[in-house]
Amino acid sequence: SDKIFYDSLLDNLSEQFEQFELDELFIVNKIIIDISSLSLKNNRLDNLEKAIEMSQKIMAKIQDWNRMPILKLIEWKYFLIKQKDIIKAEQSFMKACLFAQMTADQYLENKLIQEWEKDVKSY
């Protein structure tokens, strides 16, 4: 099943984290974010927290903050859906907007705000 595939892929990436070169970590991070997005879309949140932590670890190592707004969006959805914690979700939302501001991406920031408002209404 997809769940078994995603879980084993995530486990393998996690186990091999230290062996990847810096340029490979950019690709690994994209894969993790894509898996996280699919997990959210399919409401399969079991390993989402682990994926978020791994992606944050990679971003810190490679100093690539461009994907951080998207990761924080995934994180706030996780906090709302799985943990039912609007306070943590709002903190992630604020961080997502902050990272969008740091990259001077006004369009992304506006999209994040729209998505947040939609998510809070359905919470």
Task: Show the residue positions of the predicted features.
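TPR/Sel1-like alpha-solenoid repeat signature
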Residues: K72-E75, S92
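Alpha-solenoid helical repeat architecture
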Residues: S1-I4, F17-D34, A60-L73, Q101-I113
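Structural motif corresponding to the intra-repeat A-B loop/turn of tetratricopeptide repeats
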Residues: N42, K82-Q83, T103
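Residue at a conserved register position within TPR or TPR-like alpha-solenoid repeats
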Residues: S39, K72, F79-L80, V120
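Amphipathic alpha-helical segments of tetratricopeptide repeats
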Residues: L10-Q19, I52-A60, M94-D105
